Amino acid sequence: MSSRRRTTVAFVAAALSALVALTSTVAAQSPNRELIDGLEYQLLYAALPLTLFVLMILIYAAVKFHDNDDPQPTTEDPALEITWTAATAIILLFVGLSGYSVLVNPYISPSQAIDTDDRSQEGFDSFQDLPDTGDEEVHVRGYQWEWQATYPDANVTTENQIVIPAGEDVTFWLTSDDVIHSLFIPDLGVKQDAFPGDYTRARTVVDEPGRYDVVCAEFCGAGHSRMQGEIVVVDAETYDQWLSENEGTVAEAPNPD
């Protein structure tokens, strides 16, 4: 086997290995992450063959016509023009429908509460006016530069820790005390902005107990990089017991193990 052929084979093998690594992921821990990952792979599988097809045409044209000393204008070909126009329309339709099917999912775009100007600067009193979602609810307030969570059923508060039960639908109601913050949980595929004076909603369900990093994804001042926290997911029994034991207090999150 020639040196050039060995190089080509090695390059193809490396490319295939990279593709396998790219498309191999651990099981998603929430429907949010599962939906987002699924959309990304759908678009990847559609884009990859198209990219290779275009590259093959470019390589073919470069090799075939690189020494053409008498180039001629391209002749009109209505059938070819109709074909690539129709193909482009089909691809765009596929992308649009794939994206829309994810965006309308209730975990990705839950119904939002209407904006209100009646916000208490002293605590979470104004959260009480928000509609009942039927989920386990956590009220989250962002401020420079921490997250504070309150659990209305037991009036428990945590700092930079948000405790939720595993296997149950959870709604986070978010607001901000000062500037725009953004609650971002990468492992769960949850991201929602928190605005001063307004209330926004994020929704998820987490399958397994554990700890998941939380960061602020909106530049919010000099301490932005320090605005970190965690989602602590525990089983439902531990969650209920933790709420009852810490009612009316500022508490530490229970151990998910």
Each language-model region and where it sits:
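Extracytoplasmic/periplasmic beta-strand context in beta-sandwich domains
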Residues: 138, 181, 227-230
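N-terminal edge beta-strand
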Residues: 133-167
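Short beta-strands and strand-coil junctions in structured, solvent-facing domains, enriched
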Residues: 146-148, 180-181, 190-191, 239
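Flexible loop/N-cap segments at domain edges
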Residues: 176
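Extracytoplasmic entry segments of secretory-pathway proteins
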Residues: 2-147, 254-257
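Extracytoplasmic beta-sandwich strand-turn segments characteristic of Greek-key/jelly-roll folds
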Residues: 30-38, 68-84, 162, 185-208, ...
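Extracellular/periplasmic metallocenter environments
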Residues: 92-97, 192-257
